[in-house]
Regions:
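A cross-family acyltransferase "interaction/gating" segment
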Residues: 20-21, 28, 32-108, 119, ...
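Short amphipathic alpha-helix with an adjacent loop that forms part of the alpha/beta core around
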Residues: 7-17
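Intrinsically disordered, low-complexity terminal tails
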Residues: 143, 147-161
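Catalytic core of membrane glycerolipid acyltransferases/transacylases, capturing the structured
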Residues: 1-4
């Protein structure tokens, strides 16, 4: 017996009702957060219902912890650890059952779920920003992050002064 494709394995698991449920990041990568990339269709071949979860990160300094821009893992980890506060914004869409047309053409099903997620993408609350169009690490504003960090430390010290 040969190896089955990931799509085949996913279809078998979904048909069996196995627990835990299948979690798929349909973009297959991370981006700068300015939009939703085209979905890979393998996750939609099984034509199973999809609970679309939209995720966006925000922070007062504008640092985007999911956008790595091909930087090294240690450098990205250091930047993430130095960010004093982070917020994960999560939005759940209603369960999407594929239409007959979507079930027959996985790329159409993927596109429909992608459109739903784009409409449902959470927006950062006032005072918090998600990374928008900056795509280079060199564009990261170190001075802004340092100033934010200093202000946070001052607030902490003021609140915890004896």
């Amino acid at each position: 017996a040969g190896e089955s494709s990931t799509s085949d394995q996913m279809r078998q698991r979904l048909a069996a009702g196995a627990w835990p449920p299948v979690l798929v990041f349909a973009e297959g990568t991370t981006s700068n957060g300015s939009g939703i990339l085209e979905f890979r269709t393998g996750a939609f071949v099984a034509a199973a219902p999809v609970l679309a979860v939209s995720l966006r990160y925000a922070s007062p300094s504008g640092f985007d912890l999911c956008w790595t821009d091909q930087a090294s893992t240690p450098r990205h980890a250091m930047r993430m650890l130095c960010e004093p506060s982070k917020v994960a914004l999560i939005a759940l869409a209603p369960l999407h059952h594929p239409t007959k047309a979507e079930a027959a053409v996985p790329s159409e099903y993927a596109a429909a779920v992608r459109r739903t997620m784009a409409k449902n993408l959470p927006q950062p609350p006032e005072g918090l920003t998600g990374r928008t169009t900056r795509t280079l690490w060199d564009g990261w504003d170190y001075a802004k992050v340092r100033a934010f960090w200093a202000a946070e430390n001052e607030n902490y010290e003021r609140q915890n002064a004896s």
